[in-house]
Amino acid sequence: MKIHYGPVTELAVDAIVNAANTQLRHGGGVAAAIVRAGGRVIQEESDRVGWCDLGKAVATTAGSLKARYVIHVPTIDYKGGCRASLDDIYRGTKAALELCRQLALKSAGFPLLGAGIVGVPPREVAEAMARAIEEFPDVECTLCAFSAADREAIEGLKER
């Protein structure tokens, strides 16, 4: 597992992972940054997909990003008023990596899913995601540290 200090949108990987909402409306946080960087086509394709449950993942084009795909992993359901649990984050990370396998992708970049707007503690997120990532040694994964708290959480994984 690699560490990148900066936005997930900077990565040259096969897929970047988006901390989405279940409605796939990319209006804030990392989701909005991905659409700004990759273009409106990401939101348009997400609109056609329409929905993704917590703990699941769906792929869309990456527009003009360096990646080939954006894999959307919901961390919040505004309609139902629920935020992702650590189990949802673990299952969503696994679902994203299963999609990587299905699409024959060799690399993926992840923000700390749920550690931003959703407010799940970054250290707990990093640990849940690392557990899932360890199950997919065939996909080279990069965790992105966007904030000081993210950086501390990801670097804490080295102590495991």
Feature map (PLM): residue ranges:
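Glycine-/small-residue-enriched capping loops at alpha/beta junctions
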Residues: 1-86, 90-103
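Phosphate/ribose-phosphate-bearing ligand recognition and processing surfaces
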Residues: 77-160
